[in-house]
C-alpha cells in the first residue's frame, strides 16, 4: 500500500480523452454494483436498466482482491466477453475497453486470493516496488510544496483504435511464434527444456491465453520501437 498504484492508473486514464470509472472493491460489493441492474420505475410501471461503472473505456478495479469471488467473476466475465447481460438484454461494452486492477498483498487482512482462472484473463502484471531514496526525497519535496500536475488528454479514443489496427499488422514470423510457444511450454514442461531446477517454483504453467497475449504484447512493443516486425527481444 502507498506506492501510488491507483494514482498511476488514474493519471494514465486522464491522458486519454475517454470515459473513466473507478470501482472500489470492498467485501460488501455486489455484482450488480459493477455491471448494473434493473430498477422498477413506479412512474412508467416497468423495469429500467441502470448501467454500472463497467460501461466505460477505462476501468480501474481498485483493490480487486478485497471483494468476494462472485464480484470478481462479474468483472472478469465482462473483460472476456466484452459484453454484459442485465436482465434478459445483452449490452456491448464500449471500445476501447481496458481494465486495470490493483491488489494488495494476500497476507493482508480482508483480502481474497484471485483464482488462477481469473488471473489468467489479465494480459500483464506489473510489480510495483519501493522508490529509490532520491525518488522518495523528491516525493516528499513535491508533496510538501503542494505541487500538482496539470494533466490534460493528449490522445483520443479513435487514435488508440487506429493504433490497434496498425499493431495487428506488425509482422510476426513463424520462428517468433515458435519462440513464444517454447517459452510457454517451458513453464508447463520445464524438464523438456533442461530446466528441472525451476519446476518447484512453478505452480501452474502458462495457458494458451498466455501465448496469445505474449504475441500481442511483442507486437505492441515492436510498434512502440518503430518497427513493423517482431524480434526476439520484443518477446
Task: List where the protein language model places each region.
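Basic, amphipathic alpha-helical bundle interface domains used for macromolecular binding and assembly
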Residues: 144-235
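Canonical AAA+ ATPase core
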Residues: 41-46, 63-71, 79-170, 219-222
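Hydrophobic aliphatic residues
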Residues: 12, 16, 29, 38, ...
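Conserved Walker
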Residues: 7, 70, 74
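Conserved alpha-helical scaffold flanking the Walker A/P-loop in AAA+ ATPase domains
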Residues: 40-60
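Short beta-strand-centered segment that lines the nucleotide-binding/catalytic pocket of NTP-utilizing
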Residues: 19-31, 88-95
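Residue-level signature of catalytic and energy-coupling elements of molecular machines
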Residues: 1, 34, 75, 122, ...
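Walker A/P-loop
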Residues: 1-26
Amino acid at each position: 500500500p502507498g506506492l501510488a498504484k491507483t494514482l498511476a492508473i488514474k493519471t494514465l486514464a486522464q491522458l486519454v480523452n475517454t470515459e473513466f470509472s473507478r470501482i472500489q472493491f470492498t467485501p460488501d460489493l455486489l455484482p450488480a454494483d459493477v455491471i448494473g441492474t434493473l430498477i422498477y420505475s413506479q412512474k412508467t410501471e416497468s423495469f429500467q436498466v441502470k448501467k454500472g461503472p463497467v460501461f466505460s473505456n477505462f476501468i480501474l478495479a481498485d483493490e480487486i482482491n478485497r471483494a468476494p469471488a462472485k464480484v470478481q467473476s462479474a468483472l472478469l466475465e465482462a473483460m472476456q466477453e466484452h459484453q454484459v447481460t442485465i436482465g434478459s438484454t445483452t449490452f456491448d461494452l464500449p471500445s476501447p475497453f481496458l481494465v486495470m486492477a490493483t491488489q494488495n498483498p494476500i497476507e493482508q487482512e480482508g483480502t481474497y486470493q484471485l483464482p488462477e482462472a481469473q488471473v489468467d484473463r489479465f494480459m500483464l502484471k506489473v510489480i510495483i516496488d519501493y522508490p529509490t531514496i532520491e525518488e522518495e526525497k523528491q516525493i516528499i519535496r513535491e508533496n510538501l510544496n503542494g505541487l500538482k500536475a496539470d494533466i490534460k488528454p493528449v490522445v483520443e479514443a479513435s487514435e488508440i483504435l487506429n493504433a490497434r489496427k496498425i499493431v495487428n499488422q506488425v509482422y510476426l514470423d513463424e520462428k517468433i511464434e515458435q519462440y513464444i510457444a517454447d517459452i510457454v511450454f517451458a513453464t508447463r514442461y520445464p524438464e523438456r527444456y533442461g530446466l528441472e531446477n525451476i519446476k518447484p517454483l512453478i505452480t501452474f504453467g502458462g495457458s494458451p491465453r498466455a501465448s496469445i497475449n505474449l504475441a500481442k504484447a511483442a507486437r505492441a512493443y515492436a510498434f512502440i520501437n518503430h518497427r513493423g516486425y517482431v524480434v526476439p527481444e520484443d518477446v
